[in-house]
């Protein structure tokens, strides 16, 4: 009896989905890499092109704008064809976007890089819209949230690798001249340093493009499970009306927007936050940036460990209740980030990652409960909610560019936005818990 219970998470009707699960789970690590090699690039591009934090944050606008633009086209595509086809198209666009970094570097301008990011994340949108519900379908509905949490547990491993590569193969190898020094360069000196820095920046993207192509061909030639039902008829508007009438889905999309915004803000602007704190303690700017990225890696390790721990705890707790507890804890740590103007504020910012670990897949799993084959469109709505990562970081960057807010360092004050996000998440967790209690009683 116990053995059957252990096998059930990756089995359905006596069929094991272990190999497909492993292959699709590898994609979770791949988009984690893309996300977290990109977050530090806001600061890097700002320095390379001598721009403000707000202009640098356009990287996040392009990056998460691609998610938003392709979510429903991806859903229509996988409804017409299959999850596997969606995964393959996503990998193809991911690789193409990564390879576009080379012509962008040859142009030597900022905006071609934004186009490359946009195309890359159009691929990620296809990949996530396909992979998340694909994982949910590889077993029974009762174990779907646990299965997705397990798959999502490998996402931060890719994120850790992305952070490590960003720190050691991009940030540490950029020209060490600080922001003030770059501002005083002549035009010819600026161009020479910019060309060198861009050459450093593009190499990891070209390499990951080759890795993506390898995964593409492995999945292409592997037998994968088909969609639960073949339905080439697209009832787009009626399906959307149907799923958005469900409170748990409608509120889930709204909440996911704020969660992704909080995650990207915390992981992007830890560089600015840490740099300010460490320079205040006498560290040089380039050293402060690299050290801040080390704190970001610690945050991701904490995120990764917490994901596995919370996935286990989820076996014994109501998903909404655990989500609410983690959101309240995240809000408390964010309050510390705002109020503390020393290294303890940075410690609080690192601790926030432990609280965020379970949020994305838990919100995702709760929102898609009971949607059946409509989960293809439901997943698209949740992927569109990743737009929060495009909208909210530029707002935070604009606050940071103010330098001071009500006598407080603007970097600290800017974290009021993630705090608000955690309040929204806590409310969703609470309402989910109430709905679960209502079902038990009713």
Model-flagged regions — what are they?
Residues 1-27, 31, 47:
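Cytosolic juxtamembrane N-terminal segment immediately preceding the first transmembrane helix
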Residues 126-140, 357-372:
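Intracellular juxtamembrane helix-capping segments at the cytosolic ends
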Residues 110-130, 344-359:
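Hydrophobic core of transmembrane alpha-helices in multi-pass small-molecule transporters
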Residues 58-78, 297-309, 388:
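Central cavity-lining transmembrane alpha-helices of secondary-active solute carriers
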Residues 70-83, 170, 306-319, 400:
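Helix-to-loop junctions at the C-terminal end of transmembrane segments
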Residues 216-223, 419-442:
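Multi-pass alpha-helical transporter architecture, strongest
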Residues 38-42, 162-173, 242-296:
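Extracytoplasmic gate region of multi-pass secondary transporters
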Residues 92-107, 328-341:
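C-terminal ends and interior cores of transmembrane alpha-helices
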């Amino acid at each position: 009896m116990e053995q059957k219970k252990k096998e059930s998470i990756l089995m359905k009707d006596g069929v094991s989905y272990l190999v497909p699960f492993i292959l699709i789970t590898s994609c979770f690590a791949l988009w984690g890499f893309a996300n977290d090699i990109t977050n530090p690039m806001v600061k890097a591009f700002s320095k390379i092109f001598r721009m403000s934090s707000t202009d640098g944050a356009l990287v996040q606008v392009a990056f998460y704008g691609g998610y938003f633009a392709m979510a429903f086209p991806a859903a229509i595509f996988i409804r017409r064809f299959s999850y596997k086809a969606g995964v393959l198209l996503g990998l193809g666009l991911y690789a193409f976007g990564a390879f576009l970094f080379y012509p962008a570097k040859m142009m030597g301008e900022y905006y071609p890089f934004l186009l490359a990011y946009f195309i890359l994340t159009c691929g990620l949108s296809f990949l996530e819209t396909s992979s998340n519900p694909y994982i949910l379908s590889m077993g029974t509905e009762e174990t779907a949230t646990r299965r997705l949490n397990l798959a999502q547990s490998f996402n931060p491993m890719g994120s850790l690798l992305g952070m490590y590569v960003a720190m050691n193969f991009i940030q540490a190898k950029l020209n060490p001249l600080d922001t003030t020094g770059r501002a005083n360069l002549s035009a010819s000196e600026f161009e020479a340093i910019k060309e060198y820095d861009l050459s450093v920046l593009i190499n990891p993207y070209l390499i990951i493009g080759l890795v993506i192509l390898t995964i593409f061909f492995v999945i292409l030639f592997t037998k994968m499970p088909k969609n639960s039902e073949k339905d080439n008829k697209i009832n787009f508007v009626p399906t959307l009306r149907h799923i958005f009438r469900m409170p748990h889905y409608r509120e889930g999309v709204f909440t996911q927007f704020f969660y992704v915004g909080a995650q990207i803000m915390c992981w992007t602007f830890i560089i600015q936050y840490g740099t300010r704190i460490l320079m205040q303690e006498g560290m040089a700017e380039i050293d402060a940036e690299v050290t801040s990225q080390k704190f970001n890696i610690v945050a991701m390790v904490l995120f990764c460990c917490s994901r596995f721990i919370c996935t286990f705890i989820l076996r014994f707790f109501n998903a909404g209740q655990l989500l609410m507890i983690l959101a309240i804890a995240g809000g408390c740590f964010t309050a510390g980030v705002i109020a503390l103007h020393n290294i303890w504020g940075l410690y609080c910012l690192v601790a926030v990652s432990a609280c965020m670990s379970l949020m994305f897949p838990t919100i995702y799993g709760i929102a898609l409960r009971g949607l059946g084959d409509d989960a293809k469109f439901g997943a698209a709505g949740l992927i569109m909610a990743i737009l929060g990562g495009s909208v909210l970081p530029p707002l935070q960057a604009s606050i940071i560019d103010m330098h001071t807010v009500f006598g407080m360092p603007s970097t600290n004050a800017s974290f009021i936005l993630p705090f608000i996000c955690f309040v929204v998440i806590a409310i969703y967790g609470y309402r989910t818990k109430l709905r679960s209690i209502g079902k038990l009683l009713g």
